[in-house]
Amino acid sequence: MVIREAVASESRPAATEAKAMFSWIRPISRGWRICSAENLIVAAAFLLAATPATSPSHAQAPATPIRIDASRPAQEPDLAQYDEGSATAPNGDTLGLNSRYLMRNGKPWLPVMGEIHFSRVPRERWEEEILKMKAAGVDIVSTYVFWIHHEEVEGHFDWNGQRDLRAFAQLCARHGMMLQVRIGPWDHGEVRNGGLPDWVLKQGPTRVNDPIYLASVHIWYAQIAAQLKGLLWKDGGPVIGVQLENEYSKRGPGAGEAHILELKRIAVACGFDVPFYIVTGWDNASVPPRAVLPVYGGYPDAPWDSSITKLPPDEVYAFRSQSRVTAGAAEDSTRLAPDTKTPTAEQLPFLTAELGGGIEDTYHRRPVIAPDDIAATVPVMLGSGVNLYGTYMFQGGTNPDGALSTLQESQDTGYPNDLPIKSYDFQAPLGEFGEERAALRKLKVFQYFLNDFGAELAPMTVSVPEMQPRNPADFSVARASVRSSGNYGFIFCNNYVRGYVMPARPAAQFLIRLPHGELAVPRHPIDLPSGAYFIWPFNFNADGITLRYSTAQLFARVADSGINTLYFEAVRGIPVEFAFDATTVRTLKASSGETLRDSGTMIVSGFQPGVESSIDALSAQGNQVRIVVLTAHEAENAWKVRLGGSDHLLITDQDLVADRDAQPGQIWLRSRGAPRFAFTLTPPIASPLKANLPLALSSTTSGTSSFSAEAPSWSVPLEYHQIQTAGTAPPVKLGPAFDWRPNRVAQAPGPGDLPQAAEWEITVPEGSLTGLSELFLQIDYQGDVARLTANHRLLDDDFYNGKPWLVGIRRFLAPQGPSTFELSILPLREDAPVYFELGELAHFGSSGQIDKVDDIRLIPEYQLEITPGESLGRKTD
């Protein structure tokens, strides 16, 4: 019964279509579902009234304008219904908030937050991974502190090695990264018992105001506080907030808001005096008024779902105009809380902590996340009013070894899903071994936009189109919104849904009613391609020049020699057009396209994007402004860096590590597989560069400097051979049922099943790392579960999902001599009740099972180190 997805736009039976109508009721929490009767009644009534007979609709969209009324007068935000802790640092810097947005030093602030779990990453890699996150535009690092990782045995605390929270926080401080600490006591994070040690469960009731439980929590919180002493915001440190509990919606005596308040009281008593105390806000969460801030999220898939078929369209691709919890929901979870004093959405800013940067593979559901699956959610969430963009996970990891047990979530421990024992890759933008994925590059474009223009976006309010989708499965209506302040703002649009083909929208045009009249964007209707998503500015003040609109996405600002350069990204499939208020422009010259005047507007149409193409203008006040429109490929590969005291965009296909605030600047480029490097700097660099490899200046223009380098080619033989053939895989067992998921799901094989695995021995020669930053072992296989061991110690594991398994082995190589690994692959049974999104499995044959290795190879990762130096490089012809 192995289920394989074949075609994204397949036709589906009526029962499946009906399921699509109700798909958005599915909550976003990773593995838990708590739906109140009120939620279900409201949802059912809404859908019966609004849902079409067949859904999703794949019909060609009609040629209709997208009308949005954003004419209401801008209103000042109210005071937030929240009492923050100490919010002033010793240097006078302050953090705060009002009812609409966060503030830094009294000014609007829209930060980017990314999740990494320090205890799942080797200590020696922390600094590099923090720098990667920073280079990609992350402002705040978020991390769980898993109780079971630090006190697996009662009274024996481990804060050493990769469990050293204090050292991790100090690294964040060193690199100017703020830190949000999620202190539990229950965390989830796909960890055993949600992070609670086994001995805590044996004490009695948990997650309620039980005296024995709270006494243990007090000791736990005090331990964390001791680790972070002197590192809080008020001390000049990076810790700006703590999260209490997670996905908490218990009600009853000693539970609910009373429990959250007690946890906060204990945290404060232990020394946690921070600006922001947060709780997750979904699943009818407990949000005591004024004490905590709710944060929200959403994921591109639901591997905790019991279905082993393709899921309906996910709500995360539809704008949340009525709720912060889910698109189309009638009520926000905070409004459903029994305490009528609970703050409403209008009294607190829309903050997020768990917008999926990927998703885990569970044993029974193995989704494969594409880069657009992640990036397309960004304009949706920002266009829904989000004013803290928090990604879970931003960096994957590996579960540490436990002293008493393995540390992953499993059905054997009463939890709903089976996860790999070691791997927590999460298909994140930064993988388990630090590899930079395409999703990182796409996310980075939006994160740079928030870095440079978030302060302008934060105060803006949301306006929605006159016509909106009736539910997330309704594809017949364009998905869009506007955030604006007066006549100035941004258009947000998404025409992408994971796993489905959205219709192209011919003759699309945004007609925005503003306080001073209507604005048409663009001036003539265009065809909106299937799969497009973007953020476009309108009436944007470009250093004195009013940009009426652009059909390219603004994403970065770089100042160079008194000239502000604005960088835009061309949206694939949409012609680039700029319209300027002619009264604000003295002169304008475009390197391509046609420039014309129309009713007081200066229009550049047919502009050809590329790093060498620009629009150079002089404002009526005499300010020089340059606009550069990069192709989508160039923008996704552009990094903001600082070299020799000046800011640049560095465009490269290679991975990048850099501290963009460091002086004079140092950059590491990484190339996986090929020894060649190439990069372009814009604006061009005036100071010299040096590198660890011969660096050639391949070209220079008025707008760019381009360089290339090549490392000595690496070649090391890899030896592997099969040492055991597979036995007969046992029938797949089903795990327990749950109230919220009555259908039982497949359970991962246990230790008793391992003797049936096929085995291979892999030998990596001594010295294989010479000249490399990392060495990856790529295993192309088909099977059920794969494990990599050395001397019978499990190093990493994988649930097969149709993609090659990539393992960074630098951390596993022997210090001397060759390194030997054992690869075991448990056969996949043809009748396994498991969902595979990708991968055409080979013929199972008469055995009814498959365990197959197509190839095992080593992939070198080369490194180019760049710093300001003595020469610009060797000029090439």
Q: For each of these PLM feature ranges, what is it?
A:
Residues 508-512, 581-582, 783-795:
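Short, surface-exposed beta-strand/strand-loop-strand elements in extracellular ectodomains
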Residues 38-52:
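Bacterial N-terminal signal peptides
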Residues 126-192, 264, 268:
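Aromatic-lined substrate-binding rim segments of carbohydrate-active enzymes
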Residues 174-328, 335-361, 380-386:
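Active-site region of glycoside hydrolase catalytic domains
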Residues 202, 213-228, 235-243, 256, ...:
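Carbohydrate-binding surfaces of carbohydrate-active enzymes
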Residues 61-140, 869:
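N-terminal carbohydrate-binding accessory modules
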Residues 768-791, 798, 823-824:
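Aromatic-lined ligand-binding clefts that engage carbohydrates, nucleic acids, or primary amines
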